[in-house]
Amino acid sequence: MTNEELAKEIALGIIKTGVEGSYGSVSCSTAGDYPSMGVSQWEGLGGRGDLLLSYLDGGSYFAGRSYSDIKYRGELPALKALLESKQGQIAQQMILAQDCLDRYVPQLKRVPTLDDSRCFIYAGIWCPTSEYVVRQFLTNRFTRCNLRSLEALKNLFKDEYYIGAGVGEIYKDGYANRAENTYYYVAGIDLTTPYGVPIYGEAGNGR
């Protein structure tokens, strides 16, 4: 698979597993009074959230505004509907795929032995937590974990990622559930029809 194809599938995985949010997600950023929007919680008020809005008919109405202003005017449902529209979904897929291509794929390419397509996509779906942490986590463990095995990779994230990410026991169960859900998603996607990747379980290296 090409870098662009890998980025596209990572983006779809992030969206379909809902690890960051849904198309219509709108919340107040923890960093300030501006909205965090969509499947990657892009932030508005001059950030990438405003870039997303610029692609949408009527999006300019919400661009550059604080979360509290939108909320107190009772316009959160309208913003949510705009993000959930077909146009909103396509724009989010496009921006997220570009983010994956620019940020996640280059970092994962630096991990030794991470050259199976499904395993690469699996790791990519974890990258919103921090692509740098994911890269270092896998690089530190590739000599004792088969990164070409989707099941082994799942168990590694399930058992150890909360340690590698330095977030403590409070995230252990949540990360374990995320590891399982992501595993079942990636194991079930069809990479054979569009890309010619061998069916899952029939080849050790699918890229």
Describe each PLM feature range.
Residues 1-112, 117-120, 124-207:
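Cell-wall polysaccharide-cleaving catalytic domain and substrate-binding groove, primarily
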